[in-house]
């Protein structure tokens, strides 16, 4: 009886440890994709954004809501030129085939009004479809310069 109990316990632990390692791997993938986003801002890399943004993607920032096409246009042909971008303090929250990533996006560059340094608090919602992660919704809050 003790042998069966021990075997059942080991089998259960093996299943859970496998689930955790899969989750850890998927979390690392999502963090890398978030970093790909930041790098694509600097490069104005439309191909990366087309790969990352799901059809039907929706983005909100402050008082506006925009579509996938609007985001693609803004990051590739917008008036601002991003020269630095990186993420900080990212956390992945998994819900099966859906994940929410929160963190800080720090962006620097120049635009029509001169140089800028921006800090965004972001919440990105990712869905795994056909063995790849795509972002379906994103919200950014631009921290006012007086609060940085």
What does each of the following model-derived ranges do?
Residues 4, 16-148:
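A beta-strand edge to alpha-helix "cap/lid" segment located at domain peripheries
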Residues 4-12:
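Sec-dependent N-terminal signal peptides
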């Amino acid at each position: 009886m003790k042998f069966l109990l021990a075997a059942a316990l080991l089998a259960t632990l093996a299943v859970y440890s496998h689930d955790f390692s899969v989750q850890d791997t998927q979390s690392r993938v999502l963090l890398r994709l978030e970093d790909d986003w930041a790098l694509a801002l600097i490069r104005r890399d439309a191909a990366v954004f087309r790969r990352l943004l799901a059809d039907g993607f929706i983005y909100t920032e402050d008082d506006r809501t925009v579509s996938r096409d609007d985001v693609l246009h803004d990051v590739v042909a917008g008036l601002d030129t991003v020269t630095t971008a990186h993420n900080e303090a990212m956390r992945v929250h998994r819900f099966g085939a859906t994940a929410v990533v929160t963190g800080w996006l720090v962006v620097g560059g120049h635009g029509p009004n001169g140089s800028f340094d921006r800090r965004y608090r972001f919440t990105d919602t990712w869905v795994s479809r056909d063995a790849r992660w795509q972002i379906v919704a994103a919200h950014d809050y631009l921290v006012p310069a007086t609060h940085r």
